[in-house]
C-alpha cells in the first residue's frame, strides 16, 4: 500500500518501519517540557495520506509511560483518509503524570 507523507519541517525524523515488526515509530517534531498534571499535544510534524477506506493509528509505545510518564488521553488516535490537508498535522494528546522532557526526534 502506498502512503504519502508530507514533512512540515526539515528536522522531522523520517518515517521507517521498526526493525522487528510492522509498525512505524513517530517522533516529536520539537522539544517539549511538560509539567506534571499538564496536557500537551505532541506534534509529529507530518501529514499522512492513505488510500480511501484505510486508516492510520496513533498509539503509544509500551515504553512511553515508563520513559516519560505520559498517557495518551484518547487511547488510540484514528486518522482516516480524509485527514490529509495541508494543516492536518498528526499530533498525540498526552497527560503528564510527572514532569518530563521529550526531545525532538524522540
Annotate each language-model stretch with its function.
Residues 1-106:
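DUTPase catalytic domain/fold
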Amino acid at each position: 500500500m502506498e502512503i504519502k507523507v508530507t514533512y512540515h519541517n526539515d528536522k522531522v525524523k523520517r518515517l521507517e518501519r521498526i526493525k522487528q515488526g510492522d509498525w512505524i515509530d513517530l517522533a516529536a517534531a520539537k522539544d517539549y517540557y511538560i509539567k506534571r498534571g499538564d496536557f500537551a499535544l505532541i506534534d509529529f510534524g507530518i501529514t499522512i495520506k492513505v488510500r480511501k477506506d484505510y486508516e492510520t493509528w496513533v498509539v503509544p509505545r509500551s515504553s512511553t509511560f515508563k520513559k516519560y510518564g505520559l498517557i495518551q488521553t484518547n487511547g488510540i488516535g484514528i486518522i482516516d483518509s480524509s485527514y490529509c490537508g495541508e494543516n492536518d498535522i498528526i499530533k498525540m494528546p498526552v497527560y503528564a503524570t510527572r514532569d518530563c522532557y521529550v526531545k525532538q526526534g524522540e
